[in-house]
C-alpha cells in the first residue's frame, strides 16, 4: 500500500471483492479488496467528480453487506461487530488542474444549516496522478509513474495528430522506445488502440 507506506508480501492476505454490475444492477467500482484489516476501494476518474463520496457510500454499503454475509456476522446481536476499516482513494488524471491531494467529503453535498450536524460521513482522498504531481507516490510506484508518462505523451500527440487513434499509436511507439509500460503496451497494443 504505497499511500500508507505499507508493504504486504503474502498474497494470501489479499481478498479481492470488486463489485460487478451483473449482481448489483449497474453498480460497479474499479477495484476493491481486503488486506491488513482494511477494506480498500480504488476508483479512477478522468474528470473531476465531487460526488465520489456519495458513490463511495453506495459501494461500501454493498461491500459491507457482502462481508457480513460471507463471515456469517450477526448484525442483530448484542455483540459489537469488528469490521475492516474503509479506505477510499480516487485516482484523478483529468485535464483540469487539481492539487496533488484533495479530501472529498459526503457532508459537503448535504444541504447545510448551521445547527444541524450530519450523522453520516464518507471521505474520499483524491490523488492527482497526472505527470508532475505526487512525486513521492510516483517514486514509490514506478508503474503508476509510467502510466502518467503515457497519458502525458498521448495528450502531447493529440495536439499534433488528426485522430485519437494516430495520437495513441505514436504515443505507444514513443513510450516503448523509452521503456515506459513496454511490456503492457506490446502485449495489449490492439486493445489500447
List the model feature ranges, each with a label.
Residues 1-193:
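Elongated, amphipathic alpha-helical interaction scaffolds
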Amino acid at each position: 500500500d504505497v499511500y500508507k507506506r505499507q508493504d504486504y508480501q503474502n498474497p494470501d492476505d489479499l481478498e479481492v471483492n470488486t463489485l460487478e454490475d451483473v449482481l448489483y444492477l449497474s453498480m460497479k467500482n474499479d477495484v476493491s479488496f481486503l488486506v491488513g484489516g482494511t477494506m480498500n476501494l480504488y476508483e479512477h476518474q478522468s474528470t473531476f467528480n465531487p460526488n465520489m463520496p456519495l458513490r463511495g457510500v453506495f459501494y461500501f454499503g454493498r461491500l459491507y453487506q457482502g462481508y457480513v454475509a460471507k463471515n456469517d456476522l450477526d448484525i442483530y446481536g448484542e455483540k459489537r461487530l469488528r469490521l475492516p476499516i474503509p479506505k477510499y482513494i480516487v485516482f484523478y488524471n483529468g485535464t483540469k488542474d487539481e492539487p496533488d491531494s484533495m479530501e472529498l467529503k459526503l457532508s459537503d453535498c448535504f444541504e447545510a444549516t448551521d445547527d444541524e450536524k450530519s450523522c453520516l460521513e464518507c471521505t474520499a482522498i483524491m490523488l492527482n496522478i497526472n505527470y508532475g504531481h505526487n512525486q513521492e507516490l510516483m517514486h514509490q510506484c514506478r508503474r503508476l509513474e509510467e502510466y502518467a508518462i503515457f497519458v502525458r505523451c498521448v495528450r502531447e500527440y493529440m495536439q499534433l495528430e488528426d485522430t485519437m487513434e494516430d495520437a495513441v499509436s505514436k504515443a505507444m511507439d514513443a513510450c516503448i522506445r523509452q521503456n515506459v509500460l513496454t511490456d503492457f503496451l506490446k502485449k495489449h497494443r490492439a486493445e489500447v488502440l
